[in-house]
């Protein structure tokens, strides 16, 4: 943090300065022609700065990496590495992936595959823990169930970010009855 402040205050050189580019400010919806001072993998400041390396961005646009907050890599029918090549090329640098389709077919082996595979991608991938395996109680996946106790060890994994979507109207109905939640109350709130 101290290095960022020193660069921003002009007391230290940035590692890289992107010169003369157009910065897309996604918060204010403005496009500003300015320089971007970078130290390490962080933006230190915008404005007139000097750096150890300068990249001329004349006529180019500089934007933050995009974040896809909910997606299913396996729906693209490619590996995480192959998916990331296309996503990164279009500006997506971070995704939150729910691998429930793969996990519903392969069980924990599918989840383990996904966690191992995302390590080799050039983007940040957070895995959301599939919450409904199998997805319905009228279909069996052959790989068994993943219950809360099965999820516990995965919560220690830094790549597992949270709990994924709850699927299936019948499952919701069963859970509401099991825990005495009024289905009528839920229907009126939906």
Give, region by region, the residue ranges found by the protein language model.
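Di-metal (Zn2+ and/or Mg2+/Mn2+) metal-binding site signature of metallo-dependent hydrolases
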Residues: 60-82
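Glycine-rich, phosphate-binding/catalytic loops in enzymes
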Residues: 54-55, 83-85
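Divalent-metal coordination cores built from histidine and acidic residues
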Residues: 4-7, 84-190
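Hydrophobic "anchor" residues on beta-strands that sit immediately upstream
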Residues: 16, 64-66, 94, 161
């Amino acid at each position: 943090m101290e290095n960022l402040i020193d660069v921003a205050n002009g007391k230290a050189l940035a590692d890289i300065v992107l010169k003369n580019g157009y910065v897309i400010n996604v918060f204010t919806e403005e496009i500003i022609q300015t320089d971007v001072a970078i130290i390490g993998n962080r933006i230190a400041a915008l404005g007139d700065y000097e750096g150890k390396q300068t990249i001329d961005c004349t006529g180019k646009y500089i934007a933050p990496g995009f974040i896809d907050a909910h997606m299913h890599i396996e729906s693209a029918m490619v590996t995480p590495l192959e998916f990331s090549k296309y996503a990164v090329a279009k500006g997506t640098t971070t995704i939150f992936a729910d691998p429930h389709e793969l996990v519903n077919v392969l069980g924990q082996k599918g989840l383990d595959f996904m966690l191992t595979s995302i390590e080799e991608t050039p983007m940040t991938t957070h895995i959301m823990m599939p919450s409904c395996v199998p997805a319905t109680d009228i279909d069996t996946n052959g790989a068994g169930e993943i219950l809360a106790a099965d999820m516990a060890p995965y919560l220690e994994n830094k790549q597992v970010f949270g709990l994924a979507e709850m699927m299936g109207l019948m499952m919701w109905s069963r859970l509401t009855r099991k825990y005495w939640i009024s289905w009528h109350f839920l229907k009126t709130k939906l």
